[in-house]
């Protein structure tokens, strides 16, 4: 059975990483590192392992199994049916507008025909950027928090800001009317996990950032758990599609839109081949989820259609 130590070692490592990420997740520093390491990393050795087993003429099946498991974990095999939806929600980390202009960003946002737009890192660096951007988005009302902005062309029934503990970021909670029914939209941007020198055994940064993220995620979960009726949670959640935090969002809100109606890996942070921008919905069904291939930020926008 174990005709190739290399092939089986690779396959067992990939399976072990997936199992530990799901079962233990962020409960320990080592497994948190596994959760937040881009899934594409575990796919990188696959070509070499396959070539080695083909050359040795042994262990090819095991190497292929490990490759398929790694490709599945990276989202490369993901493919869901898609149809048009009546409600369009866009989330986009705009990186303070440093890689774009009001004209370019405004044109992009208009082209999506989104009913609701959730922006993160919307504390624009250039003076007057936000005013010029809004001038290019007629018909949208704006709700601002520190570093987050929600725009909508739907009637706004209520709006509030919620502070994270020990942080300057704010969660925006906007209630709009859609088809005569109240719909709550939560725009969130929890902080990222800070690795520091954790791979070398220095946990001085990662432990506090794990605690900070846990507190921030609890804030978001408290918000969505207190709301009733249809709800969309979206934003740069700095959370890969595995691990404890990801499962908490699904349990509290509902399915991940990309899982339901996306195709391909959905990498919204292409520099690290990572999917960390999400939308989760309750009382709505995602019919199409698309990561837009644009270069106006280090993130890519996620556009989801719902019915």
Roles of regions detected by a PLM:
Residues 1-132:
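N-terminal, active-site-proximal structural segment of metallo-dependent hydrolase catalytic domains
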Residues 2-53, 59-65, 175, 225-231, ...:
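Metal-dependent phosphoester-hydrolase catalytic domains
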Residues 34, 88-94, 105-129, 185-188, ...:
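Active-site beta-strand/loop signature of hydrolases that rely on acidic residues for catalysis
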Residues 70-82, 94-96, 101, 116-193, ...:
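Structured beta-strand-rich core segments of catalytic domains in phosphoester-bond hydrolases
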Residues 91-101, 194-210:
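Acidic/histidine-rich helix-loop elements
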Residues 100-101, 166, 208-219:
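Soluble or luminal CAZymes and related metallo-dependent hydrolases
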Residues 106-108, 133-136, 202, 249-252:
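Glycine-rich, phosphate-binding/catalytic loops in enzymes
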């Amino acid at each position: 059975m174990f005709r190739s130590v290399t092939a089986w070692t690779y396959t067992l490592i990939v399976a072990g990483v997936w199992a530990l990420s799901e079962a233990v997740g962020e409960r320990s520093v080592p497994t948190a590192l596994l959760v937040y390491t881009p899934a594409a990393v575990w796919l990188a050795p696959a070509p070499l392992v396959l070539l080695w087993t083909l050359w040795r003429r042994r262990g090819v099946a095991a190497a292929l199994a490990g490759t398929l498991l790694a490709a599945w974990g990276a989202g490369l095999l993901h493919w869901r049916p898609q149809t048009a939806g009546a409600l369009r929600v866009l989330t986009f980390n705009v990186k303070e507008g440093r890689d774009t202009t009001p004209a370019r960003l405004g044109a992009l946002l208009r082209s999506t025909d989104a009913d609701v737009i959730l922006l993160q890192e919307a504390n624009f660096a250039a003076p007057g950027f936000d005013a010029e951007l809004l001038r290019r988005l007629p018909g949208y009302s704006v709700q601002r928090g520190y570093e987050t902005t929600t725009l909508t062309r739907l009637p706004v029934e209520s709006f509030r800001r919620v502070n994270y503990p020990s942080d300057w970021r704010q969660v925006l909670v906007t209630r709009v009317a859609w088809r005569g029914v109240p719909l709550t939209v939560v725009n969130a941007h929890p902080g990222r996990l800070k690795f520091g020198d954790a791979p070398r055994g220095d946990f001085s940064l990662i432990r506090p950032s794990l605690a900070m993220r846990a507190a921030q995620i609890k804030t978001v979960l408290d918000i969505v758990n207190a709301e009733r009726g249809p709800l969309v949670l979206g934003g740069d959640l700095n959370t890969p599609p595995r691990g404890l935090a990801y499962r908490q969002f699904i349990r509290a809100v509902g399915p991940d839109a990309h899982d339901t109606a996306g195709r391909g890996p959905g990498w919204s942070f292409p520099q690290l081949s990572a999917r960390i921008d999400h939308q989760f919905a309750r009382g709505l069904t995602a019919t199409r989820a698309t990561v837009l291939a644009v270069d106006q930020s280090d993130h890519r926008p996620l556009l989801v259609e719902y019915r």
